[in-house]
Amino acid sequence: MEQIILNILEALRCGETVDDKALVKLIHAEARREGADKRDLAKRRLLPFYQRVKREEPARWAGWNVDAELERQLLQVLRMKPRRTASGVATITVITKPWPCSGDCLFCPNDLRMPKSYLHAEPACARAEQNCFDPYLQVSARLTALSQMGHATDKIELIVLGGTWSDYPQGYQTWFMSELFRALNDDAVASVAANPMLARPGISRAEAGRLLDDAPADALPPVVAERRERYRAAGIATDEAELASGVAGEQERVDVAVGGYNRAVRRLYGPGTPWGEVAEWQAATMEELERQQRINETAKHRVVGLVIETRPDAVTPQALTLIRRLGCTKIQMGIQSLDQHLLDINERRISVAQIERAFSLARLFGFKIHAHFMLNLLGATPDGDKRDYERFMTEDAFMPDEVKVYPCALIEGSRLVGCYERGEWRPYTEDELLDVLADDIVVTPAFCRISRMIRDFSSDDIMVGNKKPNLRQLVENRLAARGDGATVREIRYREISTAGADLDELTLDEEVTYETPVTRERFLQWVTPEGKIAGFLRLSLPDRAFVAAHADELPTTPEEAMIREVHVYGMAARVGDQGQAAQHHGLGRLLVERACQIARDAGYAHINVISAIGTREYYRHLGFCDHDLYLQKEL
């Protein structure tokens, strides 16, 4: 292992490019020389080895003569999955525990090991289950993996999934958020011995779970070891066979429509069960949460974005106020369709009017809106889906900031199976699906980001429907073949990603403006001559008359503008590190200054920013002061 590191360092000193192809050659050559299994020298093991030597054997590390610049280059070579932090932050996704759902959609999976709509084989769900759905344990596991893969973890976006957030008891919501912050504040990073999938590449997730249970105590952060033992003592299983057998009887009844998901979840996770026992201590006060938030303002791992998901009918002023106090900055909202007939026959139990109100409220509260939109629902057609999506992107009541657009897939146990067997629903052909998605990308405006085109379902879980994980690539190939690639404006297609940006070539584009029923929106973006995006800001100028008329529901006054998002792209740089990527070169500050000027010129007396907990210090340095749910600056 050491010799490979030394060979990489020598190549870098000589000015050679060490890309993945060159690294594989170095690994294979060393494996042959040592007569070793090349899996034992895999890329994913090199960085943890380097980090361990630097931390535990300083004399040995000093002999390698690695200065700061050489180390930066080395880490760039050894970093696993660089796309993970290409958007500028490191993302950690966590899953809440199974809980009764206020909806019962026709297409929704009913996996009793998971919260509604999720499957236990999805990567984030499998990790959550191995960690007893505990927020502290989940963050520790992901923080460990990201650190050992070489990613900067100073800036974290937390994504909390699990269906409708507001369905959970308020005490659980507060506890869950408090534990997320606590894990980051504690720097709960385990050693390689506590990350079996890294130490032994290729093993199954189930085997990794068993190895983790046997990890030496000193390999785990103290709270992790204590918490895992607490769940074990309560009888919470993490073994795959136990997990499957524990729900088998109830799952069989749900799959054949004898009883329902909610009834079964109450029996499996309610009072009188091991989960009912641990629920007694899964609660926290708002004061405890706020203490963890204050610590996180200057912590090593700061929360720069916090996301929950919900349904439009659960979006109320009261719910949004609580969500904001918890520290949230973005809401994922299941829309699925704007066709009321489709919503009804797919049993969504929501109306288009509720969707409109949810969007207006979320905007006025300052949240970023990340919508879920589905194709190929029961009753849908390709042409109808195209019209529906275009309406979603262009009608002023909607126009989300971000969207997941993905095709409906048939999952065993969902009530859609009966429709399929009766011939009432069929999946689109690949050609139909690519045609719809290609049209959808083209009509997506410059202020919107298409974050996903597929769910993270395993192909084994999909009975019929798209099973190709590279669907987005196929769609982009279709666009290129049609000659439409140059017309794509959506954000993800234009991100500078892992590439650097020539700051001298960037210009501030202020041309993207649009109106909603309650705001005038300004989308400011730093762009390259080729149209690539290096950073952006979302500015909302609320309708003064509307805000005044709804003063009892809203946390702001008619004289307050709102910055809903500031984001600078490029490989995530550590706080204070002046790297080559676009971050930390004042682009965000310039965006904020321009937004303040626009709001001032429009006659607003104050401007709010929906700051994440970990960005409060940044905005204070820009002249903002704490003001109830936001940070505020006088104009």
Sequence positions of predicted segments:
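Flexible, acidic/Gly-rich N-terminal and inter-domain linker regions that tether
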Residues: M1-Q138, R142-Q282, A446
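Conserved non-cysteine loop/helix-boundary elements of the Radical SAM core domain that shape
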Residues: H120-Q138, L158-R182, P196-H370, M374-D431, ...
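C-terminal scaffold of the Radical SAM
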Residues: L184-N185, E277-A283, A314, Q318-R324, ...
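Non-catalytic positions within long, well-ordered alpha-helices that form the structural scaffold/packing
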Residues: R324, M393-D396, C596, R600, ...
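Conserved acetyl-CoA-binding loop-helix of GNAT-fold acetyltransferases
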Residues: G579-A599
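Conserved GNAT acetyl-CoA-binding A-motif
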Residues: Q597-S611
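Conserved active-site alpha-helix within GNAT-family acetyltransferase domains
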Residues: S611-Y630
